[in-house]
Amino acid sequence: LMGMIHHLMGQAAEVDLIGKERMNSLTGPVTAQDMAEVGLLLTLSESADEGTFKSMLEKCRSSDKDVPVIGFTGTGGAGKSSLLDELMLRIQRDNPGKKVCLLCVDPTRKRTGGALLGDRIRMNSLSNNDLYMRSLASRGSGSEISANLDRAIEVAKAVGFDLIFCETSGIGQGSDAITSVADRSLYVMTAEFGAHTQLEKIEMLDVADVVVLNKYEKRGSEDALRAIRKQVRRNRNMFDVADEELPIVATIASQFADPGVDALWQKLSPLVGFESRAPMEILGERKGVIPPERVHYLSDISATIRDYHEANSEVAQKLRLCQHLETAKEHVPSVASDIDEQINEVLEEIQEARESLASYRELAEQYRTGEYTYHVRGKPFTVQTTTESLAHSNISRVALPNFADDGELFEWLSKENAPGYFPYTAGVFPFKRTDELSARMFAGEGEPERTNRRFHYLSLGQDYVRLSTAFDSVTLYGRDPALRPDIWGKVGNSGVSIATCDDAKRLYSGFDLCDSNTSVSMTINGPAPIILAFFLNAAIDQQIEKHLAEKGESLEPLDVAYRGELPEGHNGFGLGTVGRRGDELVDAETYAEIKARTLSTVRGTVQADILKEDQAQNTCIFSTPFALKLMGDVQQYYIDHNVRNHYSVSISGYHIAEAGANPITQLALTLANGFTYVEYYRSRGMDIDKFAPNLSFFFSNGLDPEYTVIGRVARRIWAVTMRELYGANERSQKLKYHIQTSGRSLHAQEIDFNDIRTTLQALLAIQDNANSLHTNAYDEAITTPTEESVRRALAIQLIVNKESGWTKTENPLQGAFIVDELTDLVEAAVLEEFEAISRRGGVLGAMETMYQRGKIQDESMYYEHLKHDGTLPIIGVNTFQNPNAQVFDESSADDFEMELARATPDEKQACLERTEDRQTKEGDATQKALLQLQEVARSGGNVFDELMETVKVASLGQITDALFRVGGQYRRNM
């Protein structure tokens, strides 16, 4: 990485920024629309001598109008850039066509001479062509503004901008340099200014036209606002002015459509002669995602778990005491009556525990009979409790302990118990299904047909279809295929391109999505509600197609239905409605019946974990509050429409681990995120027993010792919390999770060794009763998996499940001393992490300070250091290296041979044309549907309910843009 940086900086340093060849385009008047030329003039303003700059500026001048200049200043970290971005959104909304220039100054570091110039990462409004932004370094100015800022302002005026904003770097108490270059000034601060006497020292409170108290949601802000009002009144002798008339506004710039920012724009717009159509709103109580009284939920959970173990330990001691007293009676009959009295006193306190012991012994006896019947959702399952080996040994499928000590047995029941019994440490079901393996294989590349063929290849000959879908980065960010180079290059690469409902129909065609043996997993987060609506509509329209076929009205697929030949095993099902809408093929009553039946039947999972995206990955597209609202709307829709077999979220630790977290951090952050969703959904009035069954989890498995117990610790913490803290029912107490073997453990060096690592990880997952498993292909360190590597990866778990005698017993980890020790150790570490997050205001509070991301980065760096210095041995990478291995450098590039999976230009073009054709076909219906969607969002309705209709006529990118305007874009911190 350092070599790449030095190479790039070396090339950049050779460029003469004000050389003649760069300035050749400056031949005449330049306007605000000529962004490249404006950039050249601003470069001249920073680098050229006074004479050269003045002559070139006059040569390029196109305007002499008077342009207002607004100065934006404030303390570092007060949120100036975020506030400026929110103002830009309002300016563009209320004054379309007005050209605005932003000149943002960042401090130059004395030691390196460099400046971050990072304010633009906070600016979501920059995509508008009416807005121009230039970052400037303060260089040797010695203050918060650049020495040549006045020149840059001259340029902006000369080319005809209508409004100029100048943002300074963070300032101290005595600074007011912005007033020397700006007509009007805003001072942005937060509640963290110290004692109230510190306000006396702040120069800008004397001179700023508007004072902004940002981050008003923070604790102490109301008191800070009162103190600032008092100070401004004293400074300016405004004692008779009402609070709302003071030039002071409280804002939450991080909150989209914040009424405080609306109020600020109302005060600012008359000062610059711009329109302001936003209604004035009184700053009232603002509702957070988590209610204030529940902000310490993670501490409550930690206390609940510890209290649970402590109480059961006391009960175990009493059981042990009773047992000892009974023994004493036998040996000292003379005091039997006194002992009976003591026993009876204790028995009253432990009656429930004695019943648990009796139930367990009855269960153990049933297991010994060789056959056992249990129920799942009222459906009986009768299983054999033993299996016979080739040597004719009769092996228990579930091995149970034979403790003689009642206290020891009770402690085991309270901490472990048999699989399928609270606290579900060993598994949420009594036995695994032998007729259904939990194998999932990830696929996604190119156009929908290409991935569909891979799905059919993986499913050929399988009784159960388990599809796991990877999407390209264009889809992951909610965009449509386009010719823009940064989009075109990513279309269909490392994932499938899906932009319309028809694409989803093609992708899953040939599979009956309502078959009880079919399940679909979708790895999508930012635009997950839109993709989910595509999927559910595809499933509904499949059943419409089946209904019509049963009536003898089979649909002949249109020419646009499928490109290329159908793969082996594809019967054409699902292609009849491509290019057609199911609700237009049958009457409304029939459609409603089929829709209801489909929603209650379809099986699968959508990842949709927006908290994890903010903490570890990067595909957040909507503002976090709006993204969480969408998640809540999806879950409410599931409750309202009896969606019982589909998970509304896969709370994911996998990507946290892939970003570098160790197994304890992965587990702690993931469970914390899960409990945050629980608190949020409960705050919306949802019944925990209605939504908890729709929650699933997703973990990574590596080779660290803690991975041995990651699932069992998760199940125990979840079950105890659900029962003891939330009062949830048995089904809600059962945590179900998917495991994917570690992608981070795959190495490009000696890639054949990767299958060995994956096999060990798969064995851990199967031993720990993971509900489903994906094994990575060995070549994923280099490319999207090929058919050959995927087949090998699938074979790994088939061999472990079907050939390994060890896995014939389904709870092999129980009873091992080291497993017990690891389980308690990891659980304790997770609870400590819960408390660390709680001290930072819960998951959302910790996210604001980037606690989770910082912790992940620290742990990743620790791992990389150990790997690079050899302390952590990686076979074939830093030890046991092959002297004859292929070298990975430019000298061997032409000799490198490996099949690489990439989307072809033809596939990219097909994706683009299909999307454009669909948009053209729908025409006015699309705009009408998008406006209706926005209205539902503005009114606080269920957005997903409306999305189920919108996706029938609008593409992914169209819907994303529409939701940006009512829900806001995600604003990046880094």
Identify the role of each PLM range.
Residues M2-V69:
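Extreme N-terminal, non-catalytic leader segments
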Residues E46-G51, S55-V67, L87-T179, R184-Y187:
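Nucleotide-state-sensitive switch-loop elements of NTP-binding domains
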Residues K80:
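Conserved lysine of the Walker
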Residues D162, T168-Q173, V181-L199, A208-D223:
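Conserved Switch II/interswitch segment of TRAFAC-class P-loop GTPases
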